[in-house]
Amino acid sequence: MAPEIHMTGPMCLIENTNGELVANPEALKILSAITQPVVVVAIVGLYRTGKSYLMNKLAGKNKGFSLGSTVKSHTKGIWMWCVPHPKKPEHTLVLLDTEGLGDVKKGDNQNDSWIFTLAVLLSSTLVYNSMGTINQQAMDQLYYVTELTHRIRSKSSPDENENEDSADFVSFFPDFVWTLRDFSLDLEADGQPLTPDEYLEYSLKLTQGTSQKDKNFNLPRLCIRKFFPKKKCFVFDLPIHRRKLAQLEKLQDEELDPEFVQQVADFCSYIFSNSKTKTLSGGIKVNGPRLESLVLTYINAISRGDLPCMENAVLALAQIENSAAVQKAIAHYDQQMGQKVQLPAETLQELLDLHRVSEREATEVYMKNSFKDVDHLFQKKLAAQLDKKRDDFCKQNQEASSDRCSALLQVIFSPLEEEVKAGIYSKPGGYCLFIQKLQDLEKKYYEEPRKGIQAEEILQTYLKSKESVTDAILQTDQILTEKEKEIEVECVKAESAQASAKMVEEMQIKYQQMMEEKEKSYQEHVKQLTEKMERERAQLLEEQEKTLTSKLQEQARVLKERCQGESTQLQNEIQKLQKTLKKKTKRYMSHKLKI
């Protein structure tokens, strides 16, 4: 977490006012400043079951989230507390305490369902807190989990049915932890001792039958098993005498039941060690700004009357981040070119080589910071901007070369121009002296470094502009015969034509270099895109295999339970038949003896 982020206490993240859920701008501002990956732990459960106490312990405090001391629910909406992660360096632990479910004063359960849904969508670990044992009443109170198929969509496709869509929930749902408060029973089943985890699995067993009562019994169990493949259970003794529960946050651990203190420590240790970084489809690790975006996307969807959609949330996040990734890549390119390029470059190839290195690095920056670039629109935008940057540099290089060469010509040839004006060469033999001086100055010009790509063109343009002066000196030179003058004129024309041909050749070379550079640029983008697509494909396959494995395990478990049920039923039928047969045999023997 950034050094300036220090939350001394929790803040409301999602306000619940008059049945309307609204994101708190101040809390979003805090999230936007957290650049580290986040581990998000959310707790849900009925009101007045002590959720806030556990969250305060995870924050390393006795006070923070409001505990309250009456049957009135204190927490409204969803509250957030961001603290440095105690076990994962460079990570931030985001704790979300939710409004108590089932408050009769709220009138209906609509808001409760949305609070539960948001807790599921935003967290990487979901803690469900309840009182006592896992009995049918506890399962009935967890009916919110059965509504998730009506509250969440994984894909944006309107033709996806609920069953197909909900099958993908496991790929992005959080781990599930059930905390049982004031647990007073012995952990056992059929006379055998159980661990809390075994107790949870035992409680999630399905009943055999097809009646409506059986379906109602199985539905919440099936949903928990289907949506949350990784499950954990913790039981907590009563911490202190009930009369003192109201002062729980004021009491020190020494004043509480030692067993309860140890149970809380075990719970916190598990959460710190096992809660994963919040991750989206495609292996995208969530940081503060990404969590902020998810909150806004889900809240806006609920406000519009739409279902929160994971795919849409990821795409909305991708739009923001890919746009920022383009700007980050361009900034890197500008920085690198600014440091490396000295205009004018001696050759076009020198400039293009520097561009290509900077372009490759910029593309790598984009690839590292982008995801879900549908149809590669943002990469195409980046490529277009980099092409324009290259063309701009080429233009600047050309202008810098022209300016440099023009300035050199002014310095080198101005003395000659002054001599021409003074008539020094308007005399017999003056033409030869002029040509010799001209050639000496050209040589001096060529020896000057870093003239750039316009060196020849600017020189030839200058010389062409002085042809009339050269011709005038030639015509006034009385030593030369008319024939010699004609030969000199032809030589000048030949040299001019040769220079023009050289300029055309240089232009063709520049054009060829530009075409080759564009092809190299295209191939580099394709190469990096292909590598990124391969990584994303591997990530997708891993996620799909994980989802498939989870489904197969659940299917095998259901079949096993069904077979066990059928086996038990068959065994009962066999025993019943044996008893019937025994009775008939006894009756037959009795009847036979009478005969």
Swiss-Prot record:
Catalytic class of the enzyme: hydrolase
Any Pfam family matching the protein: GBP
Gene3D superfamilies (UniProt xref): Guanylate-binding protein, C-terminal domain, P-loop containing nucleotide triphosphate hydrolases
Catalytic activity field: GTP + H2O = GDP + phosphate + H(+)
GO molecular function, one term: protein homodimerization activity
GO annotation, cellular component aspect: cytoplasm; cytoplasmic vesicle; cytosol; Golgi membrane; perinuclear region of cytoplasm
Name this polypeptide is given: Guanylate-binding protein 3
UniProt GO BP: cellular response to interleukin-1; cellular response to lipopolysaccharide; cellular response to tumor necrosis factor; cellular response to type II interferon; cytolysis in another organism; defense response to bacterium; defense response to virus; positive regulation of pyroptotic inflammatory response
Superkingdom, natural source: Eukaryota
E.C. numbers: 3.6.5.-
Family matches, as InterPro entries: G_GB1_RHD3_dom, GBP_C, Guanylate-bd/ATL_C, Guanylate-bd_C_sf, Guanylate-bd_N, P-loop_NTPase
Quaternary state and interactors: Heterodimer with other family members, including GBP1, GBP2 and GBP5. Dimerization regulates subcellular location.
Lineage: Eukaryota, Metazoa, Chordata, Craniata, Vertebrata
Positions annotated to bind GTP: 45-52, 67-69, 97-101
Keywords: Antiviral defense, Coiled coil, Cytoplasm, Golgi apparatus, GTP-binding, Hydrolase, Immunity, Innate immunity, Membrane, Nucleotide-binding
